[in-house]
């Protein structure tokens, strides 16, 4: 069996991808991980597909400069806009977050009614409903845009007791309750931090974390393709952002639920 010491690259529009990154770190402690959060251009979910694809290409180009062995797009919006493009253009495996969450939701639902909470861009592309129905044509799928969830979470507000969070979750979950979904896909990697608030509004529904499901798939790909690092290697982590290092450092520990393990550096993503 071969081993591959090259790092894994992970990117998101901002901080949200750290939820999937954390799961990946827990599953693969022997892998070197490089995270890029495009904090200077967050959110992606309110932008057009061409702009999102441009940003995703720049993010991928930056990470490819480290000689990565796999690219993990820990951003639902970027997956909707650019995953297929990057998979065709890059010489390494490219993993997203949509398909694995969809498969888990199909297995989870009992009444065949699945709701997807996502950014406006992801909803507009209908990538979740299309893929879910390709797996199970009998499903009823509601795609609910949650335009303000990402800015609120990036601002550090996600407590279920926060009045702004309560107003937003009540508004966005009302159609979900009326729809009768028994399974909700958190179709943005920022949303797991809002899980307690979402569960408060939809207590009967199972919540599917798209980033966590995808991280499990990434681990399986490494094993299948012989890309795992040496078994005795202790993996390291590095973080890069396109805006304030201080703001990222202050908020990242909330997403990771522990202090940052590696250095953080600001880069000019427009150069890539």
What is each of the regions a protein language model found here?
Residues 1-272:
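Non-catalytic structural scaffold of enzyme domains
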């Amino acid at each position: 069996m071969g081993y591959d010491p090259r790092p894994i690259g992970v990117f998101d529009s901002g901080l949200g991808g750290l939820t999937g990154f954390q799961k990946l770190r827990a599953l693969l402690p022997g892998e070197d991980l490089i995270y890029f959060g495009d904090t200077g251009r967050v959110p992606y979910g309110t932008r057009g597909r061409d702009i999102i694809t441009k940003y995703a290409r720049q993010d991928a180009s930056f990470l490819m400069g480290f000689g990565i062995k796999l690219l993990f797009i820990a951003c639902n919006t970027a997956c909707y806009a650019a995953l297929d493009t990057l998979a065709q253009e890059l010489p390494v495996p490219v993993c997203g977050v949509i398909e694995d969450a969809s498969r888990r939701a199909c297995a989870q639902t009992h009444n065949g009614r699945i709701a997807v909470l996502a950014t406006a861009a992801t909803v507009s592309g209908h990538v979740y409903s299309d893929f879910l129905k390709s797996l199970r044509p009998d499903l009823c799928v509601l795609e609910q845009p949650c335009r303000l969830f990402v800015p609120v979470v990036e601002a550090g507000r996600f407590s279920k007791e926060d009045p702004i969070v309560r107003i937003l979750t009540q508004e966005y979950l009302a159609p979900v309750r009326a729809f009768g979904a028994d399974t909700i896909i958190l179709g943005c990697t920022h949303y797991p931090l809002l899980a307690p608030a979402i569960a408060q509004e939809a207590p009967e529904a199972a919540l599917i974390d798209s980033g966590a499901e995808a991280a499990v798939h990434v681990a399986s790909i490494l094993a299948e393709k012989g890309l795992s690092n040496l078994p005795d290697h202790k993996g390291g982590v590095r973080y890069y952002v396109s805006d304030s290092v201080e703001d990222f450092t202050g908020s990242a520990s909330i997403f990771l639920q522990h202090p940052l393990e590696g250095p953080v550096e600001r880069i000019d993503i427009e150069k890539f």
